Amino acid sequence: MLTITSYFGFLLAALTITSALFIGLSKIRLI
C-alpha cells in the first residue's frame, strides 16, 4: 500500500514538474 502511494506521489510530482517546464518554455517561446 505504501509503495503504491509513493509511486503515485512520485508520478504526480514528475507530471507537475514536466507541465510546469512545458508551460514555462511555451511562455518564453511566446515572448
Curated annotation (Swiss-Prot):
Disruption phenotype: Cells have no visible phenotype or growth retardation effect under light intensities ranging from 4 to 400 umol quanta/m2/s.
Cellular-component GO terms for this entry: chloroplast thylakoid membrane; cytochrome b6f complex
Main localization (coarse): plastid
Keyword line: Chloroplast, Electron transport, Membrane, Photosynthesis, Plastid, Thylakoid, Transmembrane, Transmembrane helix, Transport
Transmembrane segments annotated in the record for this chain: 4-24
Paired cysteines (S-S): none
GO MF assignments: electron transporter, transferring electrons within cytochrome b6/f complex of photosystem II activity
Superkingdom in the source lineage: Eukaryota
GO biological process per UniProt: photosynthesis
InterPro entries, alphabetized: Cyt_b6/f_cplx_su6 (IPR007802)
Cellular compartments annotated: Plastid, Chloroplast thylakoid membrane
Family affiliation: Belongs to the PetL family.
Assembly with partners or alone: The 4 large subunits of the cytochrome b6-f complex are cytochrome b6, subunit IV (17 kDa polypeptide, PetD), cytochrome f and the Rieske protein, while the 4 small subunits are PetG, PetL, PetM and PetN. The complex functions as a dimer.
Protein name (record): Cytochrome b6-f complex subunit 6
Gene that produces this protein: petL
